[in-house]
Design a protein with these regions (language model features):
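A short, surface-exposed alpha-helical micro-motif characterized by mixed small hydrophobic
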Residues: 139-141
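ABC ATPase "signature
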Residues: 157-158
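H-loop/switch region of ABC-family ATPase nucleotide-binding domains
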Residues: 133-134
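Conserved ABC ATPase "signature" C-loop
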Residues: 151-152, 167
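Conserved ABC ATPase "signature" region
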Residues: 40, 52-69
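ABC ATPase nucleotide-binding domain signature region
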Residues: 1-43
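Helical segment within the ABC ATPase nucleotide-binding domain
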Residues: 112-125
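A short, proline-enriched helix->beta-strand linker immediately N-terminal to the Walker B motif
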Residues: 91-100
Length: 169
């Protein structure tokens, strides 16, 4: 609902601010299009205008480190290359509200450190982070408020320390 994929069954949802989601980061990738073309395709699906994509394309290409492969069809990429491109494009957004399902960690060891730095920057620049996670460390390190949901209902709302203690025992 927060990602505007579903509408409420009852009541209304009022969301103030831009929303970005890091769920399904490969959504919209066209296997026949080049990496460069996919940057524009995926960027537009993320709500970016062509001019915004053009301002960020150099940064995206540098992050995904695909070299001349950027102008080849995605179908010629390894799975790791596809994930690096999808990650680089998906993390070019700067939303007020960031929705994540766990922490993204993609690629080989050298890319992982760049990806980690990008994720920290993205999370730090969001006004609100909504993350679904069972990782005690991740929640402790990124959240200042935790809401424990059970069967769609709020079971507990409080500080990370209080909620994590109740959840994990």
């Amino acid at each position: 609902m927060l990602g505007k994929v579903y509408i409420p069954c009852a009541g209304t949802a009022r969301i103030e601010g831009s929303i970005g989601s890091l769920i399904a980061i490969s959504l919209g990738i066209d296997q026949e299009a080049t990496g460069r073309e996919n940057i524009y395709i995926r960027g537009s699906l993320l709500g970016l205008k062509k001019q915004e994509i053009e301002q960020k394309i150099g940064q995206i290409i540098e992050l995904c480190d695909l070299g001349s492969f950027i102008d080849l069809p995605i179908r010629t990429y390894s799975t790791g290359m596809q994930m690096r491109l999808a990650f680089a494009v998906s993390t070019m957004i700067r939303p007020d509200i960031l929705i994540m399902d766990e922490w993204l960690s993609v690629g080989d060891e050298s890319f992982r450190s760049k990806a980690e730095s990008r994720m920290v920057d993205l999370v730090n620049n969001a006004q609100i982070l909504i993350i679904a996670s069972h990782s005690k460390e991740l929640i402790k390190n990124t959240c200042n408020r935790v809401i424990w949901l059970e069967h769609g209902k709020i079971k507990m709302d409080g500080t990370p320390e209080d909620v994590l203690t109740a959840y994990f025992g």
